Amino acid sequence: MTNEFHHITVLLHETVDQLAVKPDGIYVDATLGGAGHSEYLLSQLGDEGHLYAFDQDQTAIDNAKKRLAPYVERGMVTFIKDNFRHLKSRLQEAGVEEIDGICYDLGVSSPQLDQRERGFSYKQDAPLDMRMNREAALTAFEVVNHYSYQDLVRIFFKYGEDKFSKQIARKIEQARSVKPIETTTELAEIIKSAKPAKELKKKGHPAKQIFQAIRIEVNDELGAADESIQQAIDLLAVDGRIAVITFHSLEDRLTKQLFKEASTVDVPKGLPFIPDELQPKLELVSRKPILPSKEELESNNRAHSAKLRVARKIHK
């Protein structure tokens, strides 16, 4: 097992630059990971500024403490080991009621994918795990071996958007009736066997969407993102900014919807004025998502599906 986090940060400058960092501001990196965004953000803060960095993976925090050592020594960064769905309560515990900016880099980090024993990847043989927080109870093994056929179909359709969800769930049900499905490669082979030959010729691994679905279920990724982004919008000071990087359509759809709800107002036309409590909280900084540059796409394969959405707080 390796404890080193080798991670190329996606949309690094675009994300932090869009936060319009104030040297004395209070900022949050909701997804510390390899600490790339945190490091660049901290480089723009003065001694009066502070960064709160969230991650539920102790390995990520341990590595970030080394990478960010100069800022740690100056007392400019606080690490919070928790799921970002507890953003508001954990910041309030730290005495923070308002923030000037926050960034999210959603999904699984590439170091987690690269650590074979974490069981995130269909490319490496490992026990079925997929927990971002290794202390959590629910694992991929539990989902694959104990969820009902109906529940498997539901999560495969909902989180994997795989049109062969029923066939795959049926194959899993058949396989586990003989013996438990214990490893990533076992599961990948079962998924492959459920798909027609012409489907296997298509670009991309046949197990990709199902592994994504199981990972999202194990970590409740969309539920956590939904709760956290709403809390972040409330915590932002007026003129504060929120930047969210997504890697698949479900994350992007969720972010787009939350930003839309907070930046539009649902009142009858012709109303002489909009009451304070109905004023939109956000303004979109960019109507369309910001995409990686040609140079970044050439140097970092993970960047291909990345989209960045940014909004600014305009009303408390």
Swiss-Prot record:
Under which EC number(s) is this enzyme classified?
Answer: 2.1.1.199
InterPro entries from the entry? RsmH, SAM-dep_MeTrfase_MraW_recog, SAM-dependent_MTases_sf
Q: Does the keyword Glycosyltransferase apply?
A: no
Instruction: Report whether Magnesium shows up as a keyword of the record.
Output: no
Where would you say this protein principally sits, based on its record?
cytoplasm
One annotated GO molecular function is: rRNA (cytosine-N4-)-methyltransferase activity
What GO biological process terms does the UniProt entry carry, in alphabetical order?
rRNA base methylation
Q: Where in the cell is it found?
A: Cytoplasm
State the reactions this protein catalyses. Answer: cytidine(1402) in 16S rRNA + S-adenosyl-L-methionine = N(4)-methylcytidine(1402) in 16S rRNA + S-adenosyl-L-homocysteine + H(+)
Pfam families linked to this entry: Methyltransf_5 (PF01795)
Which cellular component, as a GO term, is one annotated location? cytoplasm
Similarity section: Belongs to the methyltransferase superfamily. RsmH family.
Protein's name according to its UniProt entry = Ribosomal RNA small subunit methyltransferase H
